[in-house]
Amino acid sequence: MIKIAHLADIHIHNNARFDEYEQVFEKLYKSLKKEKPQIICIVGDLFDMFIEISNESKIVAGNFLNNLSTYCDELIVVPGNHDLRKRNLKRINSVETIVKLIDNKKVKYLEKSGFFDDELFPITWVNWFHSDKNTDPWKDIPHTKNKNRIYIDLFHDPINGCVNDIGYIFEKSNYRKITDFKGDYSFFGDIHKKQFFKQEYTEIEVEENEIEKYINNGWEIV
């Protein structure tokens, strides 16, 4: 059995609440030490401010990724909307910057939409790159499915029918449907509320108003 810890929406702020983050991260590390996942996967929004990332937040993020890597064989990271420079997508995003700076061989950054065969496990990651919203990997990227591999979709955006913390239901024709994801599992981020569809849906977050609340939601072991 392959054990995977699915995280999303960490939202490291620029110059605030770093002590609280460290306290919450320590609780996460203790849980990871107990569960011993082979893979940890962060599905978007490592940072909170996409326009300008402070040096302080870069240090917190770099330490966080390095620390996570000590509790797994590999750490998979993809960016979310808060990690990208929306007005200039040709610029290097904040997550890619940190991954390159820490130069940790356990940390794998998926930089585009497509199918990525894992080098350690019989998994194919199906990445829906956030800035490439018009690309559906299953329809637009030629690929022959390997029955001997586990396919896991990685997606950071609302899913049609999902609900946020105040009860708003996301229902628009431009939102992806759960049936668009053809993998064996789907790991999502963006909505900040634990919920389930046909595939597993959960995320870990530091809440804007109640930083400890996510401890009760937990994080998913798949």
What residues fall within each predicted segment?
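Active-site metal-binding loops of divalent metal-dependent hydrolases
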Residues: 8-12, 45-47, 81-83, 127-129, ...
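Conserved beta-sheet core of the metallophosphoesterase superfamily
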Residues: 159-160, 165-208, 213-216, 220-222
